[in-house]
Amino acid sequence: MQSLEILAIVALVVAAILAIVVWTIVGIEIRKTLRQKKIDRLIDRIRERAEDSGNESDGDEEELSALVEMGHHAPWDVDDL
């Protein structure tokens, strides 16, 4: 094989690896965004129900706490120290 062919094959392999890494990062960020939207919807629903009456949001609070306990940190829990 000529050196140009070897270089082309190496470039294709590197491009494929970079594409896999980039799309993996994109997928992770999309999942984070979707989970955060779900948490935001639950918080809004809890707020609306808390305004209407006092005790109807218990199920939503349990679902929210389950989401937060799954390893997703709520935006108000910042530990940047």
From Swiss-Prot:
Specify the superkingdom.
Answer: Viruses
User: What regulates this protein's activity?
Assistant: Ion channel activity is inhibited by hexamethylene amiloride in vitro.
Q: Name one Pfam family in it.
A: Vpu
**UniProt keyword annotations, A-Z:** AIDS, Apoptosis, Host membrane, Host-virus interaction, Inhibition of host innate immune response by virus, Inhibition of host tetherin by virus, Ion channel, Ion transport, Membrane, Phosphoprotein, Transmembrane, Transmembrane helix, Transport, Viral immunoevasion
Q: What is its main location?
A: host cell
Any one annotated GO CC term:
membrane
Domain comment (free text): The N-terminus and transmembrane domains are required for self-oligomerization and proper virion budding, whereas the cytoplasmic domain is required for CD4 degradation. The cytoplasmic domain is composed of 2 amphipathic alpha helix that form a U-shape.
Q: What does this protein do?
A: Enhances virion budding by targeting host CD4 and Tetherin/BST2 to proteasome degradation. Degradation of CD4 prevents any unwanted premature interactions between viral Env and its host receptor CD4 in the endoplasmic reticulum. Degradation of antiretroviral protein Tetherin/BST2 is important for virion budding, as BST2 tethers new viral particles to the host cell membrane. Mechanistically, Vpu bridges either CD4 or BST2 to BTRC, a substrate recognition subunit of the Skp1/Cullin/F-box protein E3 ubiquitin ligase, induces their ubiquitination and subsequent proteasomal degradation.
Q: What is this protein called?
A: Protein Vpu
Species whose genome carries this gene: Human immunodeficiency virus type 1 group M subtype B (isolate RF/HAT3)
